[in-house]
A protein has these predicted regions:
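Active-site histidine-anchored catalytic micro-motif
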Residues: 1-154
Length: 154
């Protein structure tokens, strides 16, 4: 079974609502329950932050963690669970810095994990499928930086 590395950073996808405030509290193991049968997962709980509060140093730490995960040749790809407020910026930084041809897929959620409309599980499943269905011949960018965002069926 392929190994997929999952880096958790917080965000709405890892949040529950307490007294009207969304707080990131869920670790990777909790978030991957619905997809546990799809792959072997290596979970790295890097940080637990609201992505609106991320600084450049946090984004750099995420990109560095991706690079470290690719140090293992057995890793099929990396999924980053991230908040939507700064996902674009962090994924762009990773795109600029990653040279490995294996996939990096960012995903998150619009609704907290305890909301009946929670989209996190579907987005995680999409991210896992994106990594597992990756074809280096068809999908790889020869210049490196194979970063994608998987969200809402896209």
């Amino acid at each position: 079974m392929p190994v997929v590395s999952v880096i958790t950073t917080g965000g709405t996808i890892a949040s529950r609502t307490t007294e009207g405030v969304a707080e990131p509290v869920l670790a990777g193991r909790d978030l991957l329950r619905d997809v546990a049968d799809l792959s072997q997962f290596r979970i790295r709980n890097l940080m637990m932050k609201d992505s609106a509060t991320l600084k450049l140093a946090d984004m750099q730490a995420i990109s560095h963690a991706i690079t470290e995960e690719f140090g293992d040749p057995g890793v099929r790809g990396v999924i980053v669970l991230h908040g939507t407020d700064s996902m674009e910026e962090t994924s762009f930084l990773a795109e600029l810095q990653q040279t490995d041809l294996r996939p990096v897929v960012f995903t998150g959620a619009q609704f907290t994990a305890d909301d009946e409309r929670s989209d996190g599980p579907a987005n995680i499943k999409l991210a896992v499928r994106t990594v597992l269905d990756w074809s280096p011949e068809e999908d790889a960018n020869p210049a490196g930086g194979n970063v994608r965002v998987a969200f809402d069926g896209m």
